Amino acid sequence: MFPIKYIDNNLVWNKDNEVFAYYELIPYNYSFLSAEQKFIVHDSFRQLIAQSREGKIHALQIATESSIRSIQEQSKKLVTGRLRDVAIQKIDEQTEALVSMIGDNQVDYRFFIGFKLIVTEEKVSLESMKKSAFMTFKEFLNEVNHTLMNDFISMPDDEINRYMKMEKLLENKISRRFKFRRLDKNDFGYLIEHIYGRDGVAYEDYEYSLPKKKLKKATLIKQYDLIRPTRCLVEESQRYLRLEHEDSESFVSYFTVNAIVGELDFPSSEIFYFQQQQFTFPVDTSMNVEIVGNRKALSTVRNKKKELKDLDNHAYLSGSETSSNVVDALDSVDELETDLDQSKESMYKLSYVIRVSAPDLDELKRRCDEVKDFYDDLNVKLVRPAGDMLGLHSEFFPASKRYINDYVQYVKSDFLAGLGFGATQQLGENTGIYIGYSVDTGRNVYLQPSLASQGVKGTVTNALASAFVGSLGGGKSFCNNLIVYYSVLFGGQAVILDPKSERGNWKETLPEIAHEINIVNLTSDKENAGLLDPFVIMKNVKDAESLAIDILTFLTGISSRDGEKFPVLRKAVRAVTQSDQRGLLHVIDELRREDTAIARNIADHIDSFTDYDFAHLLFSDGSVSNAISLDNQLNIIQVADLVLPDKDTTFEEYTTIELLSVAMLIVISTFALDFIHSDRSIFKIVDLDEAWAFLNVAQGETLSNKLVRAGRAMQAGVYFVTQSSGDVSKESLKNNIGLKFAFRSTDINEIKQTLEFFGIDKDDENNQKRLRDLENGQCMLQDLYGRVGVVQIHPVFEELLHAFDTRPPVKSEVE
């Protein structure tokens, strides 16, 4: 019953002396791929299958477990900075909350594939014949010893080395198309224990002891060590197995494919991919594939054709009509014969077995019904053969044989490639900041926002900038706040531009980090006059000069292409820059000193702003010193009474107050440049809420590109929070954005624009529907590897939900 005879590294010998080499196929991301990309993957897998002209292939999809505690502990190693103790405590509390919600482990589907190694024919010589006879005799002795003593298995070193050479060639061949990892004894141990119902152990933490004793020309292992992972009481019933361990019991049932009654059209036939999303419980699948060479396959097909023709002739001679089944079968067999004859491809005898387990019989019945219904919808009829449970159970062992021939399906490589083996939805990193879980797979999603600039293998971007887009109320500000908060806890530094003054109460709502929160509230009080003057706020004089030009041209509407006015304004700003007393009020004085009609005109225009509402924040006489410090871990800059224009308002329609408000945003955002140029070893975030307000004006667009480019060099990420992906879709900016978050949108043009921004098919109706149907707190995420998926943002803690919630409070009923 137990087929394994010997294990060495990733090689497994069975009782028939067949040798298989096993690998883990590193899963590839399959979500949101276009049809064209899916066909590329399909073709690669078809070639992987078709390159073996003979032998057997054994593919397993196993629902392993990964430890939440282990991931969280790894995340703690990433924490640095002044808030380290708070962060460690927060992660520990987070761990306990997650464990209480979903248990110690979460399901993690892994894909294993084994190839039978075929011995190449040796030249017949006296030496090889002697060696063969000696090996046969030795094998006989070993078998006698094993039968009599039943305590050890001996494997000649020559035999091991011969197959190891073959395995190296095979590995070199298959790794050109997909990423593979060789299995080891721990993998096999886990696999066998898993099949026998053992759970609760994380895959990474599992250890399997298989001691070996080296002799002069052979290696011994104990039979007991080999079968130890199978220790458990197995009771077989007609349609299920009961597996009992010391501390637990489980019930297992096996399905196999009875018939495929319709076409499985690709793409949409990826069973391995869809069942990960469909089932809330773990399901394992085994594909035992025997390769039938082209000549043998053609011969089988032609024999079948003769049988069908005989049936047709018999019906004709007896005067009855040939049944439609026979006619259809004749058409199919003709097509298959032509196809095999032209392509010279092999055929494959497939034994497809599904394993369903549950803690009790009622739950097992419910799960079995769910699995059966899922396959029914795909035109695949499953059957649970009575009395064959143990036999089907054995098909999951590495190097196992096909148990039963009654349910074999003859398929081509196209069919096997279309099942989506190895396809999964992957998002984010293995460790880092926990932001929520994948809506499709339920797996936790972790991010490391500072990782992009490290040039990690597999990433498709080295941009630290991020974009949060979506219509009002979808959750973009909440998600943005959560990521900034945890980035600060993990050792980063942040400055948040808060135009709507939504974060003013963070010191009260986030008491554990209150000492590191610095809220700069720039009111229109007279004592704040001149605090946002470019010459006051910028350390670098050159930066101050260019910002002064930007602000004054923005307010007055003077274009740099205006040959009369611009040179006059430029000259006045240059004169102030070179003087000892620097401030925007001196620009007015300098223009009046010029005393030409144009200069007086510009001076009067600028002067008209100086006492308008909160504009005095921008104008100083040079006596004001910079009072804005950004030395804390979390800095929030607010300007009271800002009035931002509506999203659809054109620049020409801006009112004076809106013009001034956007000018303030441009000044503060430019001030962030100084923050970006601080300590390069610390990851920094410049968070621009309502970014659309200045991305829609020329000066703001130039500034955003400047911030992003400076950020990449100085390990700083610029976070754009805006309502439309169109604001960040311009080529110069789009290519410099790494992480992308898109929240719900209902406008079809906006949806298409967002999908295009993500680089996925904008005309695909399924993609459009996914974005339109997102619930509050759900977003489409594109990670640093270009993978796209849907995430449910999960703050875990009630206090964070309260702190980051920007919705207006619900009015309580008056009693």
Give the location of each predicted region.
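Extended, folded cores of ATP/NTP-driven motor/assembly subunits in large transport
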Residues: 1-410, 420-421
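P-loop NTPase motor domains
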Residues: 35-53, 276-279, 292-299, 380-381, ...
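Short glycine-/polar-rich loops that comprise or flank the Walker A/P-loop
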Residues: 53-56, 109, 490-492, 517, ...
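Charge-patterned, long linear interaction tracts outside catalytic cores
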Residues: 125, 439-445, 450-452, 457-470, ...
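P-loop NTPase motor core of the ASCE superfamily
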Residues: 100-101, 540-586, 729-815
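Glycine-rich phosphate-binding loop of nucleotide-binding enzymes
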Residues: 13, 28, 35, 44-49, ...
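Conserved P-loop NTPase motor cores
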Residues: 312-314, 450-474, 479-484, 497-504, ...
